[in-house]
Amino acid sequence: MLKPFVSITKPGIIFGNLISVAGGFFLASQGSVDGGLFLATVIGIALVIASGCVFNNYIDRDIDRLMERTQGRVTVQGLIPPGVTLAYGGVLGVAGFSVLWFGTNALATAFALLGFVVYVGLYSLYLKRHSIYGTLVGSLSGAAPPVVGYCAVSGQFDLGALTLLLIFCLWQMPHSYAIAIFRFHDYRAASIPVLPVERGVRAAKHHIFWYILAFLGATLMLTLGGYAGYGYFAVAAAMGLYWLVMALRGYRAGDDQVWAKKVFIFSIFTITALSIMMSIDFQVTETEVLMTSLR
């Protein structure tokens, strides 16, 4: 009875995002962790992400029927009525934003709202189906959680928060393009205009390489900017360089789908490792404020 209501929130996506939230939170905490604030941040953003996933499942129920990997989803199988799905998503969203508003600060809540609006309002409702740039715009929603975690502590949008936003936006691109390559036939069957389908797999390989290169540079900026230590720097450099080598191997890959799946899997290891390292290898620093919380 309850299983469909859990499944529709995409627990795996929530868990993955909470790792990045924790990374941003502990990076900003600089060793002085407020347990209550951490709990409010994690619960609030988890509920917001769950809400976004529920709405995404509702919106995508027609194209999910056409894709092999999504044909078993709750909304496709009719396990939860559409009206109940919408109400459920709404309740989760209100609960999540309320927890963030009362438990953290306005700036953290604003970035959570930005991510939600981009994911549900821009990406899911329109860009995913109509534009090759859907992945690019959607990357902003995937980059919001670590910034929420960071701003929940700092109450300000500084260069550290900006660097996190850049890192996670850049990471989303090769991660998503790799999915689109090894699930190429699904995306083509559903007429979703992702880059590999619209411009070809080789063009996507070019983009994957350059985005990983940019991602590598962005990750190192956390140390060069004085926010993370050299342990983080070493891990970021090693993971980024190996991911870059994997991208180069794609030009000689005998099976693009096998290669892309490896790139995708390693992307998860990479971002998880960086989130953990920034949590434990932080630097205490004075930062230049770009934006402060309203309260």
Swiss-Prot record:
**Similarity annotation:** Belongs to the UbiA prenyltransferase family. Protoheme IX farnesyltransferase subfamily.
Write the protein's name.
Protoheme IX farnesyltransferase
Q: What is the originating organism of this protein? A: Chromohalobacter salexigens (strain ATCC BAA-138 / DSM 3043 / CIP 106854 / NCIMB 13768 / 1H11)
Per the record, the domain of life is: Bacteria
Q: What is its EC number?
A: 2.5.1.141
Q: Name one GO biological process term.
A: heme O biosynthetic process
Catalysis: reaction(s): heme b + (2E,6E)-farnesyl diphosphate + H2O = Fe(II)-heme o + diphosphate
Q: Where are the transmembrane segments?
A: 8-28, 35-55, 83-103, 107-127, 132-152, 162-182, 208-228, 229-249, 263-283
For this UniProt entry, what is the primary localization, expressed as one broad class? membrane
